[in-house]
Amino acid sequence: LYVSVHATPWEARKVLLNNPRVPNIVDQLTRLAEGGIQFHGQMVIVPGLNDGEVLEQSLADLWNLGDAVMSVALVPVGVTQFSHLYNGQSMDAVNARLLLDTVHRWAERGLAERGDRWVFGSDELYLLSDEPLPGMEHYGDFSQIENGVGAVTSLRSRVRDGLSQLPRLDGKKIGIVTGVSMTPLMPELLDLLRDATGAEFSLITMENSLFGPTTTTA
């Protein structure tokens, strides 16, 4: 079961969900836990709304639910050209580093006290903050990969593992299309593919013409 948590404090949830009658999610999650139902959580972080003290309270509430919470992913808010009603801050390098500091602190607590990392930052946070992405062992069973957690690390591993199975393509020209965020990470993979196949690879970076240039993930 995957649950979009975003925040546990009621006042923050009312703003985030634009619903003055939003139910108490801690009560709802507690009911799941008492019923023996485990779940993964996702929190889309909007700077100024559910980071800082709100985030700390949210993670503390989730921590108190014990083994019912299998993992939590922190993902930066995506602001598109259609977000006309949104007047909050976008995620930048400074905010991303602060979020990763929080992730690492709670993850280390989980490892020390429960043997489980349990809180993860999305790949986009690492890219925004220019921090190196963790290795395969960091992500366990990759339970949050659909939320963009560990996707780049998994891709790198799958490319390396599959090189020996690729056919020779000497003289072929192949274009690889990706988004803005992935562009700096692709040359090392294209070099591996070129050496394994003999093909000539060209990297094509595309801006998102549907959601706008602030949407940079591929």
Language-model-derived ranges and their functions:
Residues 1-114, 138, 146-159:
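Conserved AdoMet/S-adenosylmethionine-binding subsite of the radical SAM
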Residues 39, 82, 120, 139-142, ...:
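Phenylalanine-focused residue identity feature
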Residues 164-217:
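Redox- and metal-dependent alpha/beta enzyme cores, enriched for Fe-S-associated oxidoreductases
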